[in-house]
């Protein structure tokens, strides 16, 4: 392994360790996402406890912190295997952040960002798969699970040299969704539409209180 490849892997892990969910919630004076909602410091939980603007900020940052290290490694001609390890390192940083006592999220947005530099065609397919699954089922977690399962096949079709690292990344995502898989199996997983309904109901209650 070259010094460049090793440096990019370390850089990716440190980038991933910057938990945007926690930082955004602190800046916006929202509750700690690790202690509220689902307990997961990710965009979906921030949507639940803080609203769309905060969630969008978290989502964009989480994607970028996976995309930037991999894109830089690609520009520095890091070999495909170590490019894949750079992507995995970014996700491991998100899941086990050194700056936040190793309590992180599930790595879906960061993994998406890390895979994006492979190609826009692949990025479009991954986005379409997630959106279609969520629209049909209403489950954000199921969208992530299906996308993780299919991602290695998409990569094998477009850029086969990255299949093994992406497969490892998919396994990592699936492991982090173990509890979600169990709740889906039992029919206990909450649908993403429920978050919007709750926000709407809360807003209506606040309006009623103002009128009183």
UniProtKB/Swiss-Prot annotation:
EC number annotated for this UniProt entry: 2.3.1.275
Enzyme class, broadest EC rank: transferase
Topology within the bilayer: Multi-pass membrane protein
InterPro entries according to UniProt: G3P_acylTferase_PlsY
Alphabetized UniProt keyword annotations: Cell inner membrane, Cell membrane, Lipid biosynthesis, Lipid metabolism, Membrane, Phospholipid biosynthesis, Phospholipid metabolism, Transferase, Transmembrane, Transmembrane helix
Pathway(s): Lipid metabolism; phospholipid metabolism
Record's subcellular location: Cell inner membrane
Swiss-Prot/TrEMBL GO biological process terms: phospholipid biosynthetic process
Reaction(s) this enzyme catalyzes, per UniProt: an acyl phosphate + sn-glycerol 3-phosphate = a 1-acyl-sn-glycero-3-phosphate + phosphate
Single GO cellular component term: plasma membrane
Molecular-function annotations in GO: acyl-phosphate glycerol-3-phosphate acyltransferase activity
Pfam families associated with the record: G3P_acyltransf (PF02660)
TM annotation in the entry: 5-25, 53-73, 80-100, 112-132, 138-158
HAMAP family: PlsY
Record's function text: Catalyzes the transfer of an acyl group from acyl-phosphate (acyl-PO(4)) to glycerol-3-phosphate (G3P) to form lysophosphatidic acid (LPA). This enzyme utilizes acyl-phosphate as fatty acyl donor, but not acyl-CoA or acyl-ACP.
Protein family per UniProt: Belongs to the PlsY family.
Oligomer status and interactors: Probably interacts with PlsX.
Protein name as annotated: Glycerol-3-phosphate acyltransferase
The organism of origin for this protein: Serratia proteamaculans (strain 568)
Gene: plsY
